[in-house]
Amino acid sequence: MDILLELAGYTGIASGTAKKVVDAIDKGAAAFVIISIISTVISAGALGAVSASADFIILTVKNYISRNLKAQAVIW
């Protein structure tokens, strides 16, 4: 977790931006997953790694939100 915080600080990711991303995932996670699946199919698997990593991020954030840890999801 510390390395993620250091990386966020180094790259200049503001907590406001992170909160907006978490809110977007909270509201539209299913749409994000469907879009990533469609993009993988259309690209004949070329976007498979990107799709898998995006799905992992979405599932991790949704897991934090489901456990009422929205602030921790923003930090992550």
UniProtKB/Swiss-Prot annotation:
Classification via InterPro entries: Bacteriocin_AS48, Circ_bacteriocin
Swiss-Prot/TrEMBL keywords: Antibiotic, Antimicrobial, Bacteriocin, Secreted
Major site of localization recorded for this protein: secreted
Signal peptide boundaries: none
Family statement: Belongs to the bacteriocin class V family.
Location within or outside the cell: Secreted
One cellular component term from this protein's GO annotations in UniProt: extracellular region
Protein name (database record): Bacteriocin uberolysin
Stored Pfam families: Bacteriocin_IId (PF09221)
Protein role: Cyclopeptide antibiotic with bacteriolytic activity against most streptococci (except S.rattus and S.mutans), Listeria spp., enterococci and staphylococci.
A GO biological-process term: killing of cells of another organism
NCBIfam families from the UniProt entry: circ_ocin_uber (TIGR03651)
Name of the gene: ublA
Residue ranges annotated as propeptide in the record: 1-6
Cross-link (Cyclopeptide (Leu-Trp)): L7-W76
Record-linked Gene3D superfamilies: Bacteriocin AS-48
